[in-house]
Amino acid sequence: MKRLFASLALMLPLVASAQYVSKVWSPDNGDGTYTNPVINADYSDPDVCVVGEDYYLTSSSFAHMPGLPILHSRDLVNWEIIGHALQSQFPDKEVPEHGNGVWAPCIRYHNGEFYIYWGDPDRGVYMVKTKDPRGTWDEPVCVIAGKGMIDTSPLWDDDGRCYLVNGWANSRCGFNSVLTVRELSADGTKAISNPVLVFDGGNKDYTTEGPKFYKRDGYYWIMCPAGGVEQGWQLAMRSKSPYGPYESKTVLAQGKTKVNGPHQGGWVHTQYGEDWFLHFQDKGVYGRVVWLQPVDWSSGWPIMGKKGEPVTTYRKPKSTSTTIVNPQESDEFNAPKLGLQWQWQGDYKQYYGMPTANGVFRMFTYRHSAVKNLWDVPSMLLQKTPADKFCATAKLRLAAKAENQFGGLIMMGRGYSCLVVERVGDSFQLQQRTCNKADKGEKETKQVLATFKPTDRDKIDYHPAIYMDIYLRMNVEGGKASFAYSLNGKSFKSVGNPFTMREGKWVGAKVGMVAIDNNTKSDAGLLDIDWFRID
């Protein structure tokens, strides 16, 4: 029986301190070494800062909310999600702005506060800050309004002056591969100078982007990728002035390894005097996973990995921590707040869903007027895929008050496939709904797999519902998702056709739940999620 909130309130300190260990991927080998990726999930454009023995990471979230995930580690290998810095981004938008929003954030610790800067390619440069990264962050401040500015990184100099470097999005302003620097006010809230072009990648280092700004040994350093997400390399640039001129050097590239395009990331100097670099690798439908590389400064340049090529297995950074912990995946929905691993496909509205006193998460069927497919549905409850191979199982109850209300388990990207139950007349159909080119407006196809009698029904006259209790399962391997169901949670039957997963716009495919109402005259149906488990 599910615990009630009264009991949960007493247990919150225990729940908060519980540390999740994944069943499908852990980078810590338990012998003082780690194996990349250290985060085998889609944390695109990661950046990191260190405060004492604590490391904090954030990444791009684009239009998914809550945004700007905050992860914590004590050793750069074992990470857990501790919060989000952005709760709302487009409050006036109902349709998701796929691929827009938060691009390539930068997290810094300055004068007792944590700052995150990011570029929204359509709106400008934004900043949020807090004194407690596990708590509430301030409302976003627009530092510079305008289009095209992306991949921002601040630097507070020794004299207290603040500078900002950023890249530019060709899709918004007509050019890219250049980096510009300007001065901000000392508090970092507004620009006080115009931009100066400090680097042009041209033909040699085309698609230069994602800069991070540092200072070391009297040099101003910019570390950034070039050459594109899937096949690029990592540059380091240095100058005696923040405005250049900068000399550059390639410090990390694929070389003879299988690690394609070691891309954007952040450098960190630990309290033990070690240097490390976190970056992402693009894995297609699985998104942009996070790798950790040692950094060697002996040549005066930050040569990453082993002689400039990525390492796969290596010794762990020095640390007093021996705890193994991973980003959260499974969820029993026993807490009065939604788990930190979940995001909505757009800005959250309360009528999408909420926790309940019965220890289930309740989604309300979303009234979807567009009949072609689910691409523009903001109310999907999704999380990142946690490994190349995994099994996701959900225990669900659908209370359908009218025909055409359905809910179930989905793999979502530019194309999608879902296993759902839909009310048809006085019974339920098990269906596989698939759309391979949802982003192009392709019409969804529907395959009826089974028909069930309701497991329960309301004994009232006013808008009575019929109920379906079911376990839905998705097996993922090799970029394909296959489905199964069970009525007792023990014996599962494979159904439907394997689905070739597709990535989203700038993000990997996501797994989760969907609840839809195509009957606009009825009360909303209810999809109660008892639990969701990754194995």
Model-derived features: positions:
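Bacterial Sec-dependent N-terminal signal peptides
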Residues: 1-20
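Carbohydrate-active catalytic/glycan-binding domains of CAZyme proteins
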Residues: 19-535
